[in-house]
Amino acid sequence: MSLRDDSRSDFDSLRPGESTEQGATRRTALKAAIGVGYAAAVMPVVAQTAVSTSAEGLKAGPIKYTVNGFEVPAYAAAPAGKTGLPVILVIQEIFGVHEYIADTCRRFAKLGYLAIAPELYARQGDPRGYTDIPKLQADIVTKVPDAQVMADLDGALAYAAANGGNVAKSGITGFCWGGRIVWLYAATGKVKAGVAWYGRLVGQ
């Protein structure tokens, strides 16, 4: 199976009828995203149904850290003024670090974690402006090498260690494309736990 086919299968797995969690609001929104773009498809749904977690009591927002001379953008959230925090890496879907991913970080922060969501496509492009899924896969997703992603996650842990995180208590979670990344990074032994949301176990 090619990486392109693998990525397409990741996206297809979100459709109702392709998973055991049928009818979920996020999957319905993602199905609608085909051909019209993620942001355009989900914004009406988000406005009506999404939970937005307040940043009150948190230090939350965009960050950057350097990996091999490249500044990796990311979103991070943590309880304000706290140190020695357990760390959770939050891995994007194929659509990048959008508001749902940022909100997931804030929810973890409310529970006492330092949560970091790196923009793992940053070198290849911004997925948020795409309206055609096959083009997104061809232009960006299939051009992101696993080695690059692993290095960027190493960098995220290094950032966490220098900014109030206890990387001896670290985990990783991710969605769709990010679910596969969870399995890959968990296998390195650099995190203590990994939870993948419909991430594939096959592919390059």
Named regions from a protein language model:
Residues A50-A80:
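N-terminal cap/lid segment of alpha/beta-hydrolase-fold proteins
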